[in-house]
Regions:
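Soluble "head" domains of membrane/secretory-pathway proteins
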Residues: 2-15, 30, 34-40, 45-251
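Alpha-helical transmembrane spans of integral membrane proteins, capturing the lipid-embedded, hydrophobic core
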Residues: 17-21, 25, 29
Length: 251
């Protein structure tokens, strides 16, 4: 009798544990699909807004949902449901149109119908130069530990959104471009680190981004570790974590 009772209790405990795990996985899947999804920053194309080693939450609900919102992106439907358009200046994660297995994060610069052009390193939207002012240099260290000073600008879009951009070199390859006319239903994306960003200026690699490819809006940095360090090495956190960036709102 006692052996049978003990066996039943053990089986009941295992079943309860399994139910808790299944429920937790379902809740996590719902949150990841419909509310927030974590991403990390692998490159410096959005410096200094986002740094290599930043981990952030992206809101999935900001622009509605497409099949790219779902795990593994099954082509269950086309277009978006509960759709809302990104605004100029939003920092968004999207699937690369040329290879939809790759996620990119950039800033929305051009809306459908806009004309975008770079002239001598200055952004022009619909024929008008975007306001920018020089601010103090961005100071960083290279892979050899040497201090680098990079020109930094504050750029303000026509809707009043301001952010900083970096200028690594003068007369960069994409400092002078033809006029890009953004097609209907598409958006023009650029990185804040203008001379180190493969973005919509490179039509052969990125080009215009359809609304359907947009996954969500970057909201908050929840963790940040210096580039080259590993987040799982918790014993290095006291000196490798960028504590000042934790819970920073992405703007």
């Amino acid at each position: 009798m006692s052996v049978t009772l003990g066996t039943k209790r053990k089986e009941g405990g295992i079943a309860e544990t399994a139910r808790v795990i299944v429920h937790a996985l379902i809740i996590a899947l719902v949150i990841r699909t419909f509310l927030f999804q974590p991403f990390n920053i692998p490159s410096g194309s959005m410096e200094e807004t986002l740094l290599v080693g930043d981990y952030l939450f992206v809101s999935k609900y900001s622009y509605g949902y497409s099949h790219y919102s779902l795990p593994f992106s099954p082509p269950l439907f086309s277009g978006r449901i509960w759709s809302a358009n990104p605004q100029r200046g939003d920092v968004v994660v999207f699937r690369l149109p040329k290879d939809d297995s790759i996620d990119y994060i950039k800033r929305v610069i051009g809306l459908p119908g806009d004309h975008i052009q770079m002239i001598n390193g200055l952004l022009h939207i619909n024929g008008e130069p975007v306001k920018r002012e020089r601010i103090e240099d961005f100071v960083d260290t290279d892979e050899n530990g040497r201090t680098m000073r990079v020109k930094r600008w504050r750029e303000t879009l026509p809707n009043g959104v301001s952010y900083t951009t970096l200028e690594l070199i003068e007369n960069g390859f994409y400092d002078n471009t033809p006029v890009y006319e953004v097609p209907p239903g598409n958006f023009f994306m650029m990185g804040d680190n203008r001379d180190n960003s493969t973005d919509s200026r490179v039509l052969s690699q990125v080009g215009y981004v359809p609304l359907e490819n947009i996954i969500g809006r970057a909201q908050v940095i929840f963790f940040s570790i210096r580039g080259g360090e590993h987040a799982w090495e918790v014993w290095t956190w006291p000196w490798s974590v960028r504590w000042g960036r934790l819970l920073t709102i992405v703007r």
